UniProtKB/Swiss-Prot annotation:
Subunit structure of this chain's protein: Homohexamer. Forms an RuvA(8)-RuvB(12)-Holliday junction (HJ) complex. HJ DNA is sandwiched between 2 RuvA tetramers; dsDNA enters through RuvA and exits via RuvB. An RuvB hexamer assembles on each DNA strand where it exits the tetramer. Each RuvB hexamer is contacted by two RuvA subunits (via domain III) on 2 adjacent RuvB subunits; this complex drives branch migration. In the full resolvosome a probable DNA-RuvA(4)-RuvB(12)-RuvC(2) complex forms which resolves the HJ.
GO MF term list: ATP binding; ATP hydrolysis activity; four-way junction DNA binding; four-way junction helicase activity
Function, in words: The RuvA-RuvB-RuvC complex processes Holliday junction (HJ) DNA during genetic recombination and DNA repair, while the RuvA-RuvB complex plays an important role in the rescue of blocked DNA replication forks via replication fork reversal (RFR). RuvA specifically binds to HJ cruciform DNA, conferring on it an open structure. The RuvB hexamer acts as an ATP-dependent pump, pulling dsDNA into and through the RuvAB complex. RuvB forms 2 homohexamers on either side of HJ DNA bound by 1 or 2 RuvA tetramers; 4 subunits per hexamer contact DNA at a time.
Organism for this UniProt entry: Corynebacterium efficiens (strain DSM 44549 / YS-314 / AJ 12310 / JCM 11189 / NBRC 100395)
Alphabetized NCBIfam families for the sequence: PRK00080.1, ruvB
Listed Pfam families: AAA_lid_4 (PF17864), RuvB_C (PF05491), RuvB_N (PF05496)
EC number: 3.6.4.-
Superkingdom of this protein's organism: Bacteria
Designated name of the protein: Holliday junction branch migration complex subunit RuvB
Residues annotated to bind Mg(2+): 89
Region Large ATPase domain (RuvB-L), annotated ranges: 4-204
Cellular component, GO, one term: Holliday junction resolvase complex
InterPro entries hit by this protein: AAA+_ATPase, AAA_lid_4, DNA_helicase_Holl-junc_RuvB, P-loop_NTPase, RuvB-like_N, RuvB_C, WH-like_DNA-bd_sf, WH_DNA-bd_sf
Amino acid sequence: MERTEFEIPGGIPPRRHGGTGRDPDTSVDANIQPDDVEAEVTLRPRSLDEFIGQPKVRDQLSLVLTGAKKRGVVPDHVLLSGPPGLGKTTMAMIIAQELGTSLRMTSGPALERAGDLAAMLSNLMEGDVLFIDEIHRIARPAEEMLYMAMEDFRIDVIVGKGPGATSIPLEIPPFTLVGATTRSGMLTGPLRDRFGFTAQMEFYDVADLTRVVKRTARILEVGIDADAAVEIASRSRGTPRIANRLLRRVRDFAEVHADGHITLGAANAALIVFDVDELGLDRLDRAVLDALVRGHGGGPVGVNTLAVAVGEEPATVEEVCEPYLVRAGMIARTGRGRVATAAAWRHLGLEPPEGTIGDY
């Protein structure tokens, strides 16, 4: 794609490697602004028809919800899997909206004891949607209580301690559980089997991400050229959350250094300022590649070693960086550890050694 030059007052800041302190549930790190969380809520689609991308999941989910409404019953429990930022939380909100019911939200780490889950379940109304994010991190006592709740719509509450403890059955109204996970392999078999519908959220292609960028620009009332929307989409790592975040940062740049309208030149210049390269890799991604290639000769290297090298938590490297780097053909996961491909070497401006994966 042709690059348009755009002068940046004060010059372009140098790229730096190192830790970013990113949370595994966020993607383009250091450029998160205080109003971003509120903005993401505002930008969420409110129906399956508004939801862009994931056509297979949308069609399947539409059948599940429509069939349940026609029968007058609550839909089967839903499990949504996939990397962060692909719309799992949004899809849970849409399910509640499509059913015309309330959405109750919590997360796996918040359910440390069975009592935490019992309190939430006892407050549900008939037909409510209960959304548990990071459901793979739910504590075992709460998970075991969830089995009965999902299957029989009742729980057993233990009153007292020791030999005098008694179990009191508590009926709960029929509800639909929507679980979201970035690590479906960490779910136990009994929990996974209780979901009637499971869906894998896939990375977006550039065409769908361009539609996301244009829709967001309309909502934010920002003018944007078509080629600028494509450029932002192509650097968004296949992830709508990143596309929206990059658009807001490009908007900031255009308002400060131009007339507020986003051109291709403004988009390119802004993305350089915010350290996002042509493939959508940011500082942490390049730090991982640099540690793997320059620090360990291309690998194989374990994820814990890589995390120490870049100053991040292993979960951040594994859940945020790796999915896209593997998809982009930069890293191969082997039984002995992570290995840099020829594409990773060349992306860093280095010639890959003979025999490197992907060097044809």
